[in-house]
Amino acid sequence: SVSLAAAGHPILAIPAAMAAGACAGFVTAFLQTKLGVPSILAGIVTNTGLYTINLMAMGWSSNVNLLKQETIFTKFRALNEFGGWYEFVLAALITVAAGAVLIWFLKTRLGLSIRATGDNRDMVKASSVNPVLTVTVGLCVSNALTGLAGAVVGQMQKSADINSGTGIVVIGLACLIIGETVVGKGSGLRGVLAVILGSVIYRFLYAV
């Protein structure tokens, strides 16, 4: 995302980052479903390969900055509607939009099948649902959202570092635990709200 933004395409960088994330999810799913690689190991293998791919996308530099380049945030600031809150407002709009789409998707037939696969894969298979498809789509969607988040954060911070994702899995789990403690478990709506609220609370506590 930052590399495309540095090349003068900040808006195009967002869907490009999501597509790249979906491709990474597909590779992880392929390793799991077709090659029989355990899920944790498949994620590690994919993440290791992505390190080199990210370096190549960043022009073989460990850090890329956008200090003198346009981003989606500078374009949004040009509207002169929200003053100094423009970054918060745009990030919130993107978060709400992504959350709404995810909630809708999880209520579709495919979305319900993905959720059921996570609960009981054997039951899903017995119900004539292909678990390979649900695992693949689930990983593609989740990694696309990861790409979206990384793209937005990179453009907001006006920089990208090759090591910026270090420890993000632990942080994500912490956010999820905090969110589920506050919101509780249950429907897809609660799950999405738990992730968003948990992330906000975690960052607030981290800043304090």
Predicted regions and their residues:
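Alpha-helical transmembrane segments within multi-pass membrane transporters and channels
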Residues: 10-48, 93-99, 197-198, 202
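Helix-loop-helix "hairpin" substructures at the membrane interface of multi-pass membrane proteins
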Residues: 15-16, 24, 83-169
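Membrane-interface helix caps of multi-pass small-molecule transporters
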Residues: 3, 7, 26, 30-34, ...
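Transmembrane helix-bundle core of multi-pass membrane transporters
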Residues: 39, 50-107, 137
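Small-residue-rich segments of transmembrane alpha-helices in multi-pass membrane proteins
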Residues: 1, 45-54, 126-128, 173-176, ...
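Membrane-helix interface residues
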Residues: 8, 35-37, 108, 129
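Transmembrane alpha-helical segments in multi-pass inner-membrane proteins
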Residues: 15, 146-208
